[in-house]
Structures are given as structure tokens and as C-alpha cells.
């Protein structure tokens, strides 16, 4: 069901039920009262939501034996990353948007340091 090898469906369902119960036990605040009272209720509600979120992450890591966060993306070394603006860079509002160019060799301009 979960699509992950090694994870028990029953453990996953148990964790999901527990997390669902935690979120249901913290309904949104009542919209009545003075502005300050409403603000305080919202602030306390958001803090409880943050606590529930952190508890949910701990539940997932305990029940499933792994972190809820995805594995970080492996990036190439910084020496291989370059900015290539030979193509149309667009207007000033869209500069820098797009996929990075990766060159196999470092450009000679960066290596020499001499002015031509």
C-alpha cells in the first residue's frame, strides 16, 4: 500500500491514525471575542500545530524507522558549476531563471586570472 519496500502497511496505518487523531484534537480557534482574544487564540493554536507537526515527525521516524524528510539531493562540485549567459537571458526580471549549466572543464578565464 505504501509503496516502500521493507515498511509494514500496518505500522504505516497505525502511524497515520495516530497523527490524524493529534490534528483532530486541535480544532481551529473560535472566531468570537475581541481582536486581542482572537489573536491570542490563533497564536496558541499555531504553537500547538507546530508541536503536533514535530510530534508527527517523531512518530513517523519511530514507527517506520526513517526520517520523514527526503534524502538530500547530491549536487556536483562547485568547481563544475558555471553561469552561462551566452543564450538569451531575458529581461532584468527573469535573469537567473532556468537550469544551471554544468561544464566538464573549468573555463580558462577563471583559471588564468590575467586580463586580455
From Swiss-Prot:
Residues 23-49 are annotated as: Disordered. GO terms for molecular function: DNA-binding transcription factor activity; RNA binding. Its main location: host cell. Asymmetrically arginine dimethylated at one site by host PRMT6. Methylation impairs the RNA-binding activity and export of viral RNA from the nucleus to the cytoplasm. Residues 36-47 have a biased composition (Basic residues). Keywords: AIDS, Host cytoplasm, Host nucleus, Host-virus interaction, Methylation, mRNA transport, Phosphoprotein, RNA-binding, Transport. Residues 18-26 are annotated as: Homomultimerization. The keyword Glycosyltransferase does not apply. It comes from the Viruses. GO terms for cellular component: host cell cytoplasm; host cell nucleolus. A motif (Nuclear localization signal and RNA-binding (RRE)) lies at residues 34-50. Changing residue 17 to D: No effect on expression of unspliced viral transcripts. No effect on phosphorylation. Expressed in nucleus and slightly in cytoplasm. A motif (Nuclear export signal and binding to XPO1) lies at residues 73-84. Gene3D superfamilies: 6.10.140.630. Changing residue 99 to I: Decreased phosphorylation. Pfam families: REV. InterPro entries: REV_protein. GO terms for biological process: mRNA transport; protein localization to nucleoplasm; viral process. The modification Phosphoserine is found at residues 5, 8, 92, 99. Changing residue 92 to R: Decreased phosphorylation. Belongs to the HIV-1 REV protein family. The RNA-binding motif binds to the RRE, a 240 bp stem-and-loop structure present in incompletely spliced viral pre-mRNAs. This region also contains the NLS which mediates nuclear localization via KPNB1 binding and, when the N-terminal sequence is present, nucleolar targeting. These overlapping functions prevent Rev bound to RRE from undesirable return to the nucleus. When Rev binds the RRE, the NLS becomes masked while the NES remains accessible. The leucine-rich NES mediates binding to human XPO1. Homomultimer; when bound to the RRE. Multimeric assembly is essential for activity and may involve XPO1. Binds to human KPNB1, XPO1, TNPO1, RANBP5 and IPO7. Interacts with the viral Integrase. Interacts with human KHDRBS1. Interacts with human NAP1; this interaction decreases Rev multimerization and stimulates its activity. Interacts with human DEAD-box helicases DDX3 and DDX24; these interactions may serve for viral RNA export to the cytoplasm and packaging, respectively. Escorts unspliced or incompletely spliced viral pre-mRNAs (late transcripts) out of the nucleus of infected cells. These pre-mRNAs carry a recognition sequence called Rev responsive element (RRE) located in the env gene, that is not present in fully spliced viral mRNAs (early transcripts). This function is essential since most viral proteins are translated from unspliced or partially spliced pre-mRNAs which cannot exit the nucleus by the pathway used by fully processed cellular mRNAs. Rev itself is translated from a fully spliced mRNA that readily exits the nucleus. HIV-1 lineages are divided in three main groups, M (for Major), O (for Outlier), and N (for New, or Non-M, Non-O). The vast majority of strains found worldwide belong to the group M. Group O seems to be endemic to and largely confined to Cameroon and neighboring countries in West Central Africa, where these viruses represent a small minority of HIV-1 strains. The group N is represented by a limited number of isolates from Cameroonian persons. The group M is further subdivided in 9 clades or subtypes (A to D, F to H, J and K). This is Protein Rev. It comes from Human immunodeficiency virus type 1 group M subtype B (isolate HXB3) (HIV-1). The gene is rev.
Amino acid at each position: 500500500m505504501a509503496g516502500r519496500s521493507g515498511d509494514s502497511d500496518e505500522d504505516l496505518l497505525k502511524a497515520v491514525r495516530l497523527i490524524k487523531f493529534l490534528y483532530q484534537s486541535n480544532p481551529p480557534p473560535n472566531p468570537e471575542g475581541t481582536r486581542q482574544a482572537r489573536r491570542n487564540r490563533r497564536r496558541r493554536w499555531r504553537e500547538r500545530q507546530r508541536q503536533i507537526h514535530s510530534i508527527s515527525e517523531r512518530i513517523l521516524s519511530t514507527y517506520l524507522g526513517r526520517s520523514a524528510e527526503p534524502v538530500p539531493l547530491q549536487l556536483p562540485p562547485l568547481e563544475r558549476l558555471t553561469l552561462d549567459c551566452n543564450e538569451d537571458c531575458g529581461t532584468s526580471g527573469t535573469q537567473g531563471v532556468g537550469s544551471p549549466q554544468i561544464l566538464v572543464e573549468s573555463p580558462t578565464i577563471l583559471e588564468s586570472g590575467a586580463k586580455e
